[in-house]
Amino acid sequence: EMITNAESVDNGVEGLLFKTGQTVFAEHLLTSTLPKDVADAHLSGDLHITNLGLWSILPDTIFINVKTLIEDGIDLKGKSLGVCRIPSVKTASELSSALSMIIALISKEASQEVVLDELIPLFSKHSKDLPDLERKLVDSFTTSSTTVGYSKMPTMVSFRIPLGTDQKIVKTVLSAYKTYAKLTPIPKIGLVIDYEKGRVTDVSTILSEIVTIGGKIIFAKHNITQNGMICTKNSTSTVLHLDSLSINLPRLAFESNKDETYFRARLALLMKPALSAMALRNKTISNLIRLGVNPILAANTQYMQRSTVSLVINLVGLQNAVFGILGFQNNKEGQVILHKVIETAVDIASKKGKELGINVIVGMTHSGGAE
């Protein structure tokens, strides 16, 4: 069937192989890996697992220091023997090559997004010839764009750009990214514009041009993904987020016969096994990293000794569930119910996190029917 419908495959033969492999892993996950109640909840629509084929293999989101990755040199140990090793970076040309390789390699080690920090300090050592640096940065972006993703929605690689630091380097990076965005129909590289210590107005003209031509930009006062997932402040280690599980609150509300107490009880009962399944997923992925399946992460985290992992469970359609299906008005009483649901979710996440010995984050996602 896949070969017959090969015209829908976006990345040629590799795309066909990836799709086939993910189909096999997805079936194995649902039939042999996940607890039966969690698998049944996914199949019934009570919860949703994104990227079933990659669930047990890759983390969803990575926050990592690109300066450390490149300055330490690219050494994949005994893995990927056909990939060049760069022991150290001393020139702008070596920096360009190393950056292109890092983008290509690290994008294969997450299913959704990698956020790279410290790009500006990395370039500050090579700021004598800014036009040449810009050309080399464009080369890095364009060369890395040939990397094949695991699906039609490839892993996004974003660079955090802090405003208020080394303005000349910031403008050089923005100019290079603008050129890359012009050349790429759907960019796989994005920018996180951190304006905590700077002013967006200083670079608003070029940023508006980038957005107009389809560049991927998000504004924040901290390190964040393109989807709004926040990294812990002042974290010195690599941070991994496992966040591709969502709970369908409107469906739970529909099955609760307009009883908000029963609704919250069902939410609690669903969250507990879901978080246990995510903890099991964390162990599986951590073991694969220790075995060197993800060589960049293995080297950077010293085989998971220097890393922080968070489980993220997303609640979808809270307002639609409370105001639309349970029948509460969007007033003071309705807001009390809303807060009760959030408190229930946070309480379960906190208790389960302590039990499992891992940080658990509760995220909120609006559904199309939310008011």
Predicted regions and their residues:
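Conserved catalytic cores of very large enzyme subunits
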Residues: 3-307, 328-331, 335-371
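Conserved phosphate/anionic-ligand binding catalytic regions in large, soluble enzymes, centered on
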Residues: 305-321
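Well-ordered alpha-helical scaffold segments within catalytic/enzyme domains
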Residues: 320-328
